[in-house]
């Protein structure tokens, strides 16, 4: 079990694009059939459709929830009855590549600690409003509560401690029309049986279950480039997102 950043390998590699060099940090995880899901949701299942020893080729069929992936995005239809006709195919290229700002709230005084991992469970407007100036200049905001480390060690989720946005926080973020993407390291952006953030942020791509956010260098948190490319499944209420942070070095 990993509980400190020092023991973790850096989830990134250096690449060159034109005359610039970037550290690219992978904010995704491979999907395992044993992934811990939202309490009450079914886990992924695999069926062997064709076995290579019998047919000469291998082919598997999977039964997956729209929201099993780390990370995943939410379609407009997921928790908004007025938009139930809009599936995950609704997001175009404007949601895929954006300048980004990350606020790291894992060290907040209100953060709780469990199994050596500190995370903030309730994100409020007061945690965000000091960043209003930079939020007005980026296309994506990423909220790190510290729960990314919980996701990475695949521990069961408890509804009482899953991080979420308070109503005043989601209302605050909704006031920035330039923001196309709102990302968080929680498996949901709303508290249980509430849909406020999904309604107030209905015109944005909500990306949940981001991982490895702690690998984004401190000096880059105020401005980096973010890829959040949704795998556009027609009619789905959500789906996997290929998410990478690009930090110029």
Regions found by a protein language model. Give the residues of each.
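Active-/binding-site microenvironments in catalytic and ligand-binding cores
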Residues: 1-249
